[in-house]
From Swiss-Prot:
Full protein name: Nucleoid-associated protein YPTS_1390
Family: Belongs to the YejK family.
Coiled coil start-end: none
Keyword Transport in annotation: no
Taxonomic classification: Bacteria, Pseudomonadati, Pseudomonadota, Gammaproteobacteria, Enterobacterales
Organism: Yersinia pseudotuberculosis serotype IB (strain PB1/+)
Keyword Zinc: no
Localization: Cytoplasm, Nucleoid
A GO term for molecular function: single-stranded RNA binding
Length: 334
């Protein structure tokens, strides 16, 4: 992995009681060695694989102003990280899910792009066996479960300040959303809405097929082509590029897909990240609620599965063998 660490600082937040969150600050940057490089490579890998939200700094963002000073050389990276950790403590202490942890600030390069990653990592306990086969306790950073993480694409931020996607952060699931907490700490606003972009793409595909008056099977085959490209991009960690997608799709009528979507005003970006859950709707129907979960291929609609909109009734002809076996055994036990 071509990841080059420029500067890295570690500090710590210690929760003394329900109202007190203390700060322990390092007096020097963390020396870069093989252990540090391995840790950052793992954190970069884990973060890159997770679903993220996008944002941009508010005009009055203190962290953005401090970062600009650091980038210009008016303030060194260690001082920047120490002051930011203090603001982080003040913000985090407002929320009920506040816990201690190791606060990490790392400025690094990956594939010619400069990043600043900020994270609060939990420390976990485990057991180890030494060479004498004795047991002892050990502590480790729980990188795989890190959920308080934000990353700033410094290259994008400095070369394209109007961008709405140079800042990314993870969406948490405890108490008030961790994403809300990071918005407050960073003084940032939500930027590119990835799910909205993917929903817009699906709508554009359906409208394009309808405009060409494709039949049911032709329409589903077209959706499958769109899904195949998007899924490949998702698996490769790449974005959906409308121009490339349009080149891979058969042209319907006088306009290709990119021309059609631009003229119809779907407000799609030239490229945007793929959203797995939204894209799945191209080939499947799925839903759950009230103790019921249903998932089936879109091709089965009106073939083996029928929906009556008037009565909101779904009729299934031919049940899966394992389901049928369970139903028969339950019926036989009555």
């Amino acid at each position: 992995m071509s990841l080059d660490i420029d500067q890295i600082a570690l500090h710590q937040l210690i929760k003394r009681d329900e109202q007190t969150l203390d700060v322990v600050l390092r007096d020097s940057l963390l020396p870069t060695n093989a252990v540090v490089e391995e840790m950052m490579a793992e954190l970069h890998r884990v973060y890159s694989a997770k679903s993220k939200a996008y944002g941009l700094f508010n005009e009055q963002s203190e962290l953005a102003d401090a970062l600009k000073r650091s980038r210009k050389g008016d303030e060194d990276f260690l001082s920047f990280s120490r002051a930011a950790t203090g603001r982080l403590r003040d913000e985090l202490a407002k929320y009920p899910f506040a816990e201690g942890g190791v606060v990490l600030f790392c400025q690094y390069r990956y594939l010619a792009v400069e990043y600043l990653l900020i994270s609060v990592l939990s420390s976990c306990h485990s057991m180890r066996v030494n060479e004498q086969l004795d047991l002892s306790t050990t502590h480790y950073l729980d990188i795989n479960r890190a959920d308080i993480v934000a990353r700033i694409d410094l290259t994008e931020w400095e070369t394209n300040p109007e961008s709405t996607r140079y800042l990314t952060f993870l969406k948490g699931r405890v108490g008030r959303k961790v994403s809300d907490f990071f918005m407050d700490f960073l003084s940032a606003a939500e930027g590119l809405d990835t799910k909205a972009q993917n929903r817009g793409l699906l709508q554009a595909v359906d409208d394009y097929c309808a405009d060409a008056e494709l039949g049911k099977n032709e329409r589903q085959a077209y959706r499958q082509q769109v899904y195949s490209y998007c899924n490949e991009q998702l698996r490769a960690g790449e974005e959906i590029a409308l121009q490339v997608l349009a080149q891979e799709l058969p042209k319907l009528g006088e306009k290709d897909f990119q021309q059609f979507s631009a003229e119809q005003g779907y407000a799609l970006e030239e490229s945007f990240p793929a959203d797995r859950g939204t894209l799945r709707q191209l080939t499947k129907f799925a839903g759950s609620g009230g103790g019921l979960s249903i998932n089936f291929d879109a091709l089965l609609l009106d073939e083996r599965i029928f929906w009556d909109a008037a009565t909101d009734t779904l009729t299934i002809k031919g049940t899966p063998p394992n389901l049928r076996d369970q139903l028969q055994r339950r019926a036989g036990s009555k």
